[in-house]
Amino acid sequence: MAYRSCVVGFSSHSGCEVTPAGSSQPGTSGWGSCGLPGPGFSSRSLTSCRPAGVIPKVTVNPSLLVPLDLKVDPAVQQQKNQEKEEMKVLNDKFASLIGKVQALEQRNQLLETRWGFLQGQGSATFDLSHHYETFQGRLQEELRKVSQERGQLEASLLQVLEKVEEFRVRYEDEISKRTDLEFTFVQLKKDLDAECLRRTELETKLKGLQGFVELMRTVYEQELKDLTAQVKDVSVTVGLDSRCHIDLSGIVEEVKAQYDAIAARSLEEAEAYSRSQLEERAARSAEFGNSLQSSRCEIADLNVRIQKLRSQIVSVKSHCLKLEENIKVAEEQGELAFQDAKDKMAQLEAALQKAKQDMARQLREYQDLMNTKLALDIEIATYHKLMEGEESRMDLPSTTVVSAVQSRCRTTASKSGLSKTPSRKKKNRGGPVIKITEMSEKYLSQESEASE
């Protein structure tokens, strides 16, 4: 049984050899070496082996063309299967390497695109000072506005406090005036009560005097009546001198006139005194009533003014409380805005630091990928040059030398029209070696004829 093994790889030598079954020594003649290009570098099949150049005429001994009884060696079949498995594994590895190379090329293109984009946006990405300055200016403007509002609020608060102090002074003055007026009112009330008591006493005295006058008048009239009756009823026998005449009626009239004059004068004096006292008390009462009315009016006015001042004080206090609350709210808002600005600035700095770290990491990754790409490009270029050199070497004409061999295996190989060349395997640094083994169709046909 004969098989052909082809060694394909990224090396400077590639060959295809034909080995007869059961042979232990490699032949020195064959079809010639055939080169198999690496994947992606040529359109020729991996399983094809074209003749190298023009084959010269070969002279063969006819005795060597006698068919032999050949049998298939199981070791060769096992070796062939093993080599096929190795070929599959190596082909899979080669395909995975090609996929990795393509993925790296795509990633390289993606990184180049990203690098170009980042270079295009480099100035916009790293030039954040303008944004910081704008944001800081806006915060300073807000802080300035808050400071102005705080100054205005403090000025208005001072004005309100001055007004409150003024109202407090006025309120204290009004309170002192009210206290004085209340004291005056109490004094006037006391005087009025005293005068009322005196008036009552005088009225009582007047009534007593009037009763006394009436009593005296009644007594006088009764005495006068009694005296008149006595005078009329008493008959006096007086021995008088006829020469002396006494006018008793005149005397009685005179006494009566005196009594009447005394009673009238007493009555007039009592009436005049009572009238004067009453007029005086009435004048004083009217004066006290007027002062009391004026005091009541003043007290009512003071009460109204006090109520107004109290309402104004309450409104001013509420306004002061509102202003204090507004100041506190403004301070809290300013502190919150300042803290928020600090937090945002810290976040921006953290984002900038993170962006710088990401950029540095991407640059390191890009540098690593560029190094990997450069190494792969160098390796691919080397493999490409090696394959081009191998293809150029394979395109040159080769000579075939056939010699007769005494061994049975070589005779069988010459009868079957097959020869082989020593398999050339050259280790390549970093490149996989793929060995392809195929059955010779011609040898299989001869083997079938021999079995028949």
Swiss-Prot record:
Ranges for region Linker 1: 119-135
Organism: Rattus norvegicus
Stretch list, region Coil 2: 252-390
The keyword Coiled coil is annotated on this UniProt entry: yes
SUPFAM superfamilies, sorted: Intermediate filament protein, coiled coil region
One CC-aspect GO term: cytoplasm
Residues recorded as bearing Phosphoserine in the entry: 45
Region of interest: Coil 1A: 82-118
Lineage of origin: Eukaryota, Metazoa, Chordata, Craniata, Vertebrata
Keywords: Coiled coil, Intermediate filament, Keratin, Phosphoprotein
Family per record: Belongs to the intermediate filament family.
Additional observations: There are two types of cytoskeletal and microfibrillar keratin, I (acidic) and II (neutral to basic) (40-55 and 56-70 kDa, respectively).
Stretch list, region Head: 1-82
Gene Ontology process terms (BP): intermediate filament organization; keratinization
IF rod domain sequence ranges: 83-394
Subunit structure: Heterotetramer of two type I and two type II keratins.
GO MF entry, a single one: structural constituent of skin epidermis
Region (Tail): 391-452
Site (Stutter): 334
Listed name of the protein: Keratin, type II cytoskeletal 80
Highest taxon of the lineage: Eukaryota
Positions of the UniProt region annotated as Coil 1B: 136-227
